[in-house]
A protein has these predicted regions:
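Charge-rich, low-complexity intrinsically disordered regions
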Residues: 1-224
Length: 224
């Protein structure tokens, strides 16, 4: 599901978002471009934290674009880190609910509840879209040529989501990508950080569901 697939009120133009970081004036000065991107991402993230219902889409759209930046690996890494921190700040500690367009889920709800559900749906789609980029790159081999954040950076961002938001959406997909990255990455810190995250989750797992899921996925990958 694309992050831009939203209903009525959310389908406004991003007139306040500047997508000109690929302009010649920036490409001619890589360090200046990186600084400009950093400053702009920081401003967008701050606005999104203060007003997630109106600014989240702007921030997500630009940062996601920069995460796939073909001009600078450093800018892509900065964008990846910014988006990770933004989502960690905004995501709740429970599973978000997406709106099923086929099921008129908003019918009969009050305006306040409808607004809340739409905001939750947007956040869920934004999170899913970003995780898709991270999992795609994290699963690449050490010598793979990828646009955007490196497999190592992608893996570390996924570990942060798993550690700090273990009860949020898409835990299974995150676990698969982390375990795969631990086996394929030339960066040994990926395996070390993943092991630490798994240990912390298992220690706090009162009913054993998270622990069982981790063990099953590890066994599945080893068999392959």
């Amino acid at each position: 599901v694309d992050v831009d697939d939203e209903a009525s009120d959310d389908q406004r133009e991003d007139e306040n978002v500047d997508f000109t970081f690929s302009a010649k004036k920036y490409l001619a000065d890589p360090s200046g471009r990186r600084l400009a991107c950093r400053q702009f991402m920081a401003e967008l993230c701050q606005k999104a934290i203060e007003q997630p219902e109106t600014r989240m889409k702007d921030a997500a759209k630009l940062i996601k674009t920069l995460c796939d930046d073909p001009h600078s690996k450093e800018v892509a890494q900065d964008a990846c880190a910014s988006m990770t921190l933004l989502l960690l700040d905004i995501l709740p500690d429970y599973r978000l609910r997406e709106i099923n367009a086929d099921k008129n889920e908003l019918e009969g709800l009050s305006d306040k509840v409808k607004k809340q559900r739409k905001e939750e749906d947007l956040l869920c789609k934004t999170y899913k879209s970003f995780l898709r980029l991270l999992t795609k790159n994290a699963k690449k081999g050490a010598n793979s040529i990828v646009s955007g954040p490196s497999p190592s950076v992608s893996g570390k961002c996924l570990i942060q989501f798993l550690s700090k938001k273990p009860n949020s959406n898409y835990r299974g997909e995150i676990l698969r990508a982390i375990i795969s990255s631990s086996f394929t990455s030339s960066d040994v810190t990926i395996a070390e950080e993943a092991s630490k995250a798994f240990s912390e989750i298992c220690r706090g797992d009162e009913n054993g569901d998270h622990t069982l899921e981790i063990l099953q996925l590890m066994a599945e990958l080893v068999k392959k």
